[in-house]
Design a protein with these regions (language model features):
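Intrinsically disordered, low-complexity Pro/Gly/Ser/Thr-rich segments with frequent PxxP/GP/PP motifs
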Residues: 75-107, 194-220
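Short aromatic-acidic-glycine turn motif
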Residues: 66-79, 126, 187-198
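Asparagine-centered strand-capping/turn motif at beta-strand->loop junctions
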Residues: 50-54, 170-175
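Bacterial N-terminal signal peptides
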Residues: 11-23
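Beta-sheet-dominated interaction scaffolds and their linkers
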Residues: 27-53, 151-166, 201
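N-terminal secretory signal peptides that target proteins for export/translocation
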Residues: 1-8
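Short, hydrophobic/aromatic beta-strand segments
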Residues: 56-64, 178-185
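Terminal connector regions
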Residues: 105-150, 219-247
């Protein structure tokens, strides 16, 4: 059974933080590095460093899930293909704890595999007299397993105008590895000034498609049917020209 997709808070770097309302106390200040795990046939395990910058001990529970996408939405399912140890641990104030992530299967021959490890703060008892609401931190770290055969990044862009002046932009990842897009700027081929822009970070896994509905920037209009797409990704800058299609 697929796990429900959590409600995301604002991304910080490549790690995503979730705030869950729990009873009493203040959220611990946890920091995890690295913010992305990359495994391969010759690199089957990686150590995560968890640091507690708070003033109280913090109990952390780990969970690894398989990560896929459907209709542009993240889907998480239970898995035993990646193991996180220890599954639960306590980090003293100002101290660090090593959590190890280990691959328990062979990498896929022709496609990158994706998982996430969630590190969930387990709330302790409330301090005497506290009557507030505790915000428990949940950190999601992407895990990617490189395919046995090197994969190229292959992106297929398309777009069309919407009746209200918006632009519907599609990205089809036809390659065998993920891409993270965190900056989009769309302009006419004849004019470099951006007409549409989106700064949010989005992953598109291999074989998946994502779309953005973009509103025009103030006092900007798109001329002609040829547009230039510029994007920043986790593998570098992407720039391409496409012809607008029909809805």
């Amino acid at each position: 059974m697929a796990l429900p997709t959590p409600t995301w808070a604002r991304p910080i770097g490549l790690a995503f933080f979730f705030l869950w309302s729990l009873v009493a106390g203040a959220a611990a200040n946890l920091h995890v590095s690295p913010v992305r795990v990359e495994l391969a046939a010759g690199r089957a395990s990686v150590a995560l460093t968890v640091k507690n910058d708070g003033d109280t001990p913090t109990v952390v529970q780990t969970q690894v899930v398989a990560w896929s996408q459907q209709n542009g939405e993240d889907v998480y399912t239970p898995t035993n293909e990646v193991l996180a140890t220890p599954p639960i641990f306590t980090v003293a104030p100002g101290a660090t704890q090593i959590a190890r992530v280990a691959l328990r299967r062979e990498p896929d021959a022709g496609r990158e595999l994706a998982y996430r490890i969630f590190l969930q703060e387990v709330p302790g008892p409330p301090r005497p007299g506290f009557q507030g609401v505790q915000m428990a931190l949940r950190i999601g770290i992407p895990i990617f397993v490189e395919a046995k055969k090197p994969q190229e990044l292959k992106l297929d862009w398309s777009a069309h105008r919407e009746p209200g002046g918006e632009l519907r932009l599609f990205l089809n990842n036809v390659g065998g590895k993920h891409v993270q897009v965190y900056d989009l700027n769309i302009s006419s081929v004849e004019n470099a000034a951006p007409v549409y822009s989106n700064q949010s970070a989005s992953y598109v896994l291999p074989g998946q498609r994502r779309s953005w509905l973009l509103k025009p920037l103030e006092r900007q209009t798109l001329s002609g049917d040829r547009i230039r797409v510029k994007a920043l990704t986790d593998t570098g800058r992407v720039e391409t020209e496409i012809v607008l299609g029909k809805p």
